[in-house]
A protein has these predicted regions:
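Short, conserved active-site loops that position catalytic residues or coordinate cofactors/metal ions
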Residues: 47-49
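Short beta-strand->loop micro-motif that forms the acidic, two-metal-ion catalytic signature
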Residues: 51-53
């Protein structure tokens, strides 16, 4: 890897994350938590955004990320993990992904 690409990628990811924070609350996000490479400072040129979203929804879990991809139209690779407040409360102590995400993730927005 050539020097500087990781830093440039980090700036691109930060810029896109900032845009998400501006737009997502208007679309129903109650909490936005950055997880993955950017949240732990381990960015490579292949890194994307991983975002844990808390929102009220009746949609099945497997369909929830599509809403965010459709509405935000990310300019970088972005994965959305969407939970309802009740699911987050019920699973935060038992689900390995949530336990790790909540311990290392960076809260970017909360309505509470």
């Amino acid at each position: 890897m050539m020097f500087g690409f990781s830093q440039q990628r980090k700036q691109i990811l930060n810029s896109e994350a900032e845009r998400f924070v501006r737009e997502m609350p208007q679309l129903g996000a109650k909490k936005i938590i950055l997880v993955g490479d950017l949240s732990v400072g381990d960015v490579s040129i292949d890194s994307g955004l991983e975002v844990l979203v808390v929102q009220e929804t009746d949609h099945p879990y497997k369909d929830r990320a599509d809403f965010w991809v459709t509405h935000l139209r990310p300019t970088v690779k972005a994965d959305f993990y969407v939970f309802t407040p009740k699911e987050l409360s019920n699973l935060s102590q038992t689900d390995p992904f949530l336990i790790k995400s909540l311990s290392i993730g960076e809260v970017l927005y909360t309505s509470e």
